[in-house]
């Protein structure tokens, strides 16, 4: 049975239950299926290597952070054909996130609203999960580790949390993503301001250089940014990335705008909106970044990819790689192969 047919059969059941409950059923089931060899029939994308941030990605279609916050399902996700897997966001200490319900489907818009709030088991448990994965142990592919700050850490001390996480995850990452753009942690997006960003990037770069010397291995750092910005702020961020010699930028996170989903059930729920409604906003940010960065810094495009054509549009806007999340929920794992085929050089 093809992965497309299997997901077509499973989706009505998954969509009949709470989104977070469906998530909590699907990932353990995938892990068990992978352990039993049941995912071996999934046809993987053609080898289509891209070198980005000094890393060779086997194909340009990655998994975005957020699906596997604790790095507990890496081996199962690795069977779906991604060119990279990004897990997290992880914070220094475990935290429960926001109260439930905190995830809502908007199927008429191919969208999701979430206000999860960086729920995770903390950096030590995260690292233990990563280290125990066969994907990491056997160096099977590209693994991105996404870091954030605890909800109860004052925004003035946010840098401390990022430095703690960077120190812990650095030895195990192919690259590290610094998430300063979730709308679900109070004041987090303030870190995208000019002075706050300068202070953060300066200390991250200093720590990266020290850790590179310590571990005899350079691990690139990418910054994940929001779609809800004016051109001037995007330009300011791009200039800061160049000034501090960062390695990449991921555009974009979820949006707080509700323009595209007005009138739909759950549209007024607080949180970040992902899926089709963020597609154009993300592309606008990517184009603005590309205009500022040129070829000096690579862009990873994420936001609203639900087809191979969508993936092509991200690359046309200026991205070097793409990532999926919400599209997987609506289209299933067949989307990975479809996007990879559309981007095959």
From Swiss-Prot:
GO terms for biological process: 'de novo' pyrimidine nucleobase biosynthetic process; 'de novo' UMP biosynthetic process. Binds 1 FMN per subunit. Gene3D superfamilies: Aldolase class I (3.20.20.70). GO terms for cellular component: cytoplasm; plasma membrane. It is an enzyme of class 1 (oxidoreductase). SUPFAM superfamilies: FMN-linked oxidoreductases (SSF51395). Catalyzes the conversion of dihydroorotate to orotate with quinone as electron acceptor. The active site is at residue 182. It catalyses: (S)-dihydroorotate + a quinone = orotate + a quinol. Disulfide bonds: none annotated. It comes from Janthinobacterium sp. (strain Marseille). The lineage of its organism: Bacteria, Pseudomonadati, Pseudomonadota, Betaproteobacteria, Burkholderiales. FMN binds at residues 65-69, 89, 146, 179, 224, 252, 275, 304, 325-326. Its EC number is 1.3.5.2. This is Dihydroorotate dehydrogenase (quinone). CDD domains: DHOD_2_like. It is a peripheral membrane protein. Monomer. Pathway: Pyrimidine metabolism; UMP biosynthesis via de novo pathway; orotate from (S)-dihydroorotate (quinone route): step 1/1. Its cofactor is FMN.
């Amino acid at each position: 049975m093809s992965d497309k047919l299997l997901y077509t059969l499973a989706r009505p059941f998954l969509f009949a239950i709470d989104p977070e409950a469906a998530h909590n059923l699907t990932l353990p089931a995938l892990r068990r299926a992978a352990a039993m060899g049941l995912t071996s029939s999934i046809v993987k994308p053609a080898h289509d290597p891209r070198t980005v941030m000094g890393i060779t990605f086997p194909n340009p279609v990655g998994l975005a952070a957020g699906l596997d916050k604790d790095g507990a399902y890496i081996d199962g996700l690795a069977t779906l054909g991604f060119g990279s897997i990004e897990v997290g966001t992880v914070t220094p200490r475990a935290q429960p996130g926001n109260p439930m319900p905190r995830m809502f489907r908007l199927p008429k818009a191919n969208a999701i609203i979430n206000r999860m709030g960086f729920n995770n088991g903390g950096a030590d448990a995260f690292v233990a999960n990563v280290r125990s994965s066969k994907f990491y142990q056997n160096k099977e592919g590209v693994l991105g580790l996404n870091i954030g700050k605890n909800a109860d850490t004052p925004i003035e001390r946010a840098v401390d949390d990022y430095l703690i996480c960077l120190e812990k995850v650095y030895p195990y990452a192919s690259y590290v993503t610094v998430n300063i753009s979730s709308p679900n942690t109070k004041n987090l997006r303030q870190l995208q301001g000019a002075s706050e960003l300068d202070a953060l990037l300066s200390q991250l770069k200093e720590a990266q250089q020290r850790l590179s010397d310590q571990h005899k291995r350079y691990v690139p750092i990418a910054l994940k940014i929001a779609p809800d910005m004016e051109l001037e702020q995007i330009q300011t961020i791009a200039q800061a990335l160049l000034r501090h010699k960062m390695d990449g930028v991921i555009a974009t996170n979820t949006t707080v705008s509700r323009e595209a989903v007005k009138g739909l059930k759950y549209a007024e729920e607080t949180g970040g909106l992902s899926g089709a409604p963020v597609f154009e906003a993300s592309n606008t940010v990517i184009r603005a970044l590309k205009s500022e960065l040129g070829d000096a810094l690579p862009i990873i495009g994420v936001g609203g990819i639900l087809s191979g054509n969508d993936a092509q549009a991200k690359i046309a806007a200026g991205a070097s790689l793409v990532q999926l999340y919400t599209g997987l929920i609506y289209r299933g794992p067949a989307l990975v192969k479809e996007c990879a085929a559309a981007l095959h050089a």
